[in-house]
């Protein structure tokens, strides 16, 4: 949509927006748990990944977060930025973003065609012909803005990758990112629904691969929440013993926690209540029992070694990681069409003149927190403006 709107700014251009589904913006309407984290004020400071992280720089600078928010304001969308830099629609509804874009598409030189699933693309001397079941569309220039494979239930597809590979472009390995992690830990189901703030470190054979601080949520299959999404990109990317080390009191040292727990040794309480008031009750009991200390044990009977073990459990608890959830659960696709085959200042193919690509289909993915949508807006607008220039 961003590319179509940008291209249509040239009144001499007729834009066809071809949508495979019955309506536009279905995936966008489901982002951010229905809130749509549409940008991040810190997007120019980093937070992007791919074989060439510098590729995204030009597009992001040309249409940075401030310009993006001003653009949406002109369209009629009121936004609010959190202290973290995450930007949301003031309505707190993702559909507000979809609707504003849908309204903007109502322009004389934009024709939206839904239920248009491309079966074939033919390269011709004067452009491209896209063939679908009911009709064909001919264009002088073609922008591939199909998104990635992530979120298959909402429309994630291989279509863009296949189309571009058909024109000779190469694609890196695709894998899910910003996704939940599965665990083989037998006690994980007992914590289903528990949320906690923690510092999480992704480990492979004991070596740190990634880390983040934020909210975690336990599920019946493993780990979820923003902090897990942040570290999930590299999970199980190679063979080895993968674990997630969790610090449930990142602002405390083990000694600080131990001093608090020692105060409870003068009571008649059992270890089931040792961490009450500090952590979620269910989480506290599981962390205590993981040391081998039973819940009915009197706190007064704990020795120094017992307290040290419990404190270490709270500060450095390790959960096995077997694999990330699949593409149907992922928010974003890591990997994509190789970027050195495109001009970063126009998003045009270096292989096929008149062919452009933008967004998730390329080998660019961002951190959790609005980075990926900012890349979509920035790269889409650059591709649209470039393709929409007078020929």
Language-model segments: which ranges?
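An anion/pyrophosphate-binding glycine-rich loop and adjacent beta-alpha core
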Residues: 22-24, 29-30, 38-45, 170-175, ...
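Glycine-rich active-site loop/strand segments that organize a redox cofactor
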Residues: 33-81
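A conserved short coil-to-beta-strand element within the FAD-binding core of flavoproteins
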Residues: 114-127
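A glycine-rich dinucleotide-binding beta-alpha-beta segment and adjacent secondary-structure elements
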Residues: 114, 285-365
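Glycine-rich FAD pyrophosphate-binding loop
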Residues: 8-33
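Core beta-strand elements of the Rossmann-like FAD/NAD(P) dinucleotide-binding domain
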Residues: 113, 132-141, 211-214
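Short hydrophobic core segments
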Residues: 18, 118, 137-156, 164-165, ...
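N-terminal Rossmann-like FAD-binding beta1-loop-alpha1 element of flavoenzymes
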Residues: 1-17, 377-388
């Amino acid at each position: 949509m961003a590319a179509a709107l940008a291209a249509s700014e040239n009144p001499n251009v007729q834009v066809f927006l071809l949508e495979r589904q019955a309506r536009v913006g279905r995936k966008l309407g489901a982002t951010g748990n229905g809130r749509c984290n549409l940008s991040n004020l810190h997007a120019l400071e980093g937070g992007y990944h791919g074989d060439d992280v510098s590729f995204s720089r030009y597009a992001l600078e040309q249409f940075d977060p401030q310009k993006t928010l001003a653009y949406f304001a002109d369209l009629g969308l009121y936004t609010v930025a959190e202290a973290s830099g995450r930007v949301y629609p003031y309505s707190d509804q993702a559909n507000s973003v979809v609707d504003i874009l849908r309204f903007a598409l109502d322009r004389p030189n934009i024709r939206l065609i839904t239920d248009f699933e491309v079966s074939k693309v033919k390269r011709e001397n004067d452009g491209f012909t896209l063939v679908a079941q009911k009709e064909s569309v001919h264009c002088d220039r073609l922008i591939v803005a199909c998104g990635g494979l992530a979120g298959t239930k909402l429309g994630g597809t291989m279509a863009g990758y296949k189309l571009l590979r058909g024109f000779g472009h190469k694609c890196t390995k695709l894998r899910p990112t910003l996704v939940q992690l599965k665990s083989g830990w037998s006690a994980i189901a007992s914590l289903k629904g528990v949320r906690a703030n923690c510092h999480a470190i992704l480990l492979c054979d004991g070596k740190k691969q990634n880390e983040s601080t934020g909210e975690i949520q336990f599920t019946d299959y493993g780990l979820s929440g923003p902090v897990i999404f942040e570290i999930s990109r590299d999970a199980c990317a190679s063979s080895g013993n993968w674990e997630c080390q969790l610090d449930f009191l990142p602002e405390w040292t083990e000694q600080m926690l131990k001093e608090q727990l020692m105060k409870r040794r003068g009571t008649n309480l059992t270890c089931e209540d040792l961490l009450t008031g500090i952590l979620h009750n269910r989480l506290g009991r599981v962390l205590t029992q993981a040391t081998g200390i039973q819940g009915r044990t009197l706190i007064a009977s704990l020795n120094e070694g017992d307290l040290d073990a419990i404190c270490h459990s709270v500060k450095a608890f390790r959960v096995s990681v077997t694999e990330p959830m699949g593409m149907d659960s992922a928010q974003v696709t890591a990997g994509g069409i190789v970027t050195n085959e495109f001009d970063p200042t126009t998003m045009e193919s270096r292989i096929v003149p008149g062919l452009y690509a933008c967004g998730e289909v390329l080998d660019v993915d961002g951190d959790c927190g609005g980075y990926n949508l900012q890349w979509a807006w920035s790269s889409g607008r650059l591709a649209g403006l470039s393709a929409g220039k007078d020929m």
